[in-house]
Amino acid sequence: MTTGLLQGKRGIITGIANNMSISWAIAQLARKHGAELCFTYQSEILEKRVKPLAEEVGCNFVSELDVTNPESITNLFAEVKEKWGTFDFLLHGMAFSDRNELKGRYIDTSLGNFNNSLHISCYSLVELAREAEKLMNDGGSIVTLSYYGAEKVIPNYNVMGVAKAALEASVRYLANDMGENNIRVNAISAGPIKTLSGSVIGDFNSMLRSHAATAPLKRNTLQQDVAGAAVYLFSQLASGVTGEIHYVDCGYNVMGSNKIVG
């Protein structure tokens, strides 16, 4: 491993579901840049996927994290404090909504799924940031993952668009709250990527085709594109950057209209 932008830094990586996850690509690049990592998993099923990936990059700190359970959050940070004392960066990479409601009309969203989607996809950032602040004694960086559906209507994205809008607003408010402790909070708004979570969105393949045809770079966003931006935001190169929504979408967000692809 060569010396890199994150040499001597420690970070928590959440949101890995498999080897196609954006969080996994970020973890791989962070390790290449010298970071020591803690991987989290949400359930026993995901533990079986996450642990081999952690081993692949020489990470032996793997811990359970269920953001719907306050005790689980407390336990994670207690373990981080015991093993590391302090740490430097956090990736908030989780999002969830009932796949049956990621199609059709937003107006048909159920109360239960609305609350669950906002809790897991947005409020979890607030909870993790609150605990992280206690252990980021020398400042730090928190990065979360968003999508263009936070600001424009994307067919079938529905309640996730509302959750991502709340997430982006939370980034700005958290950046203000935590700035006095030199903790930076930013979001990466990535283009659509073939991941486990992306695949549950109705007509996702059409979304990919339209994105590639419309974006100035004429391609879809890759996990590695997002990973590079995340490592930059974790590093001292971004020491003056906070409260930002950083687009990594091959330029899609600057376009005024979509190209229709059959």
From Swiss-Prot:
Active site at Y147 (proton acceptor), Y157 (proton acceptor)
Q: Name one GO molecular function term.
A: enoyl-[acyl-carrier-protein] reductase (NADH) activity
Q: What is its EC number?
A: 1.3.1.9
Q: Which UniProt keywords apply?
A: Fatty acid biosynthesis, Fatty acid metabolism, Lipid biosynthesis, Lipid metabolism, NAD, Oxidoreductase
Tell me the GO BP annotations in alphabetical order. fatty acid elongation
InterPro entries per record = Enoyl-ACP_Rdtase_NADH, NAD(P)-bd_dom_sf, SDR_fam
Pathway it works in: Lipid metabolism; fatty acid biosynthesis
The keyword Metal-binding is annotated on this UniProt entry? no
Primary enzyme class: oxidoreductase
At which positions is NAD(+) bound? G15, S21, I22, Q42, D66, V67, M94, K164, I193, K194, T195, L196, S197
- Which reaction is the catalytic activity of this chain? a 2,3-saturated acyl-[ACP] + NAD(+) = a (2E)-enoyl-[ACP] + NADH + H(+)
Q: Which residues does this entry assign to the site Involved in acyl-ACP binding?
A: N205
Q: What does this protein do?
A: Catalyzes the reduction of a carbon-carbon double bond in an enoyl moiety that is covalently linked to an acyl carrier protein (ACP). Involved in the elongation cycle of fatty acid which are used in the lipid metabolism.
Q: Which family does it belong to?
A: Belongs to the short-chain dehydrogenases/reductases (SDR) family. FabI subfamily.
Q: Which proteins does it associate with, and in what oligomeric form?
A: Homotetramer.
Q: What is this protein called?
A: Enoyl-[acyl-carrier-protein] reductase [NADH] FabI
Gene this chain is encoded by: fabI
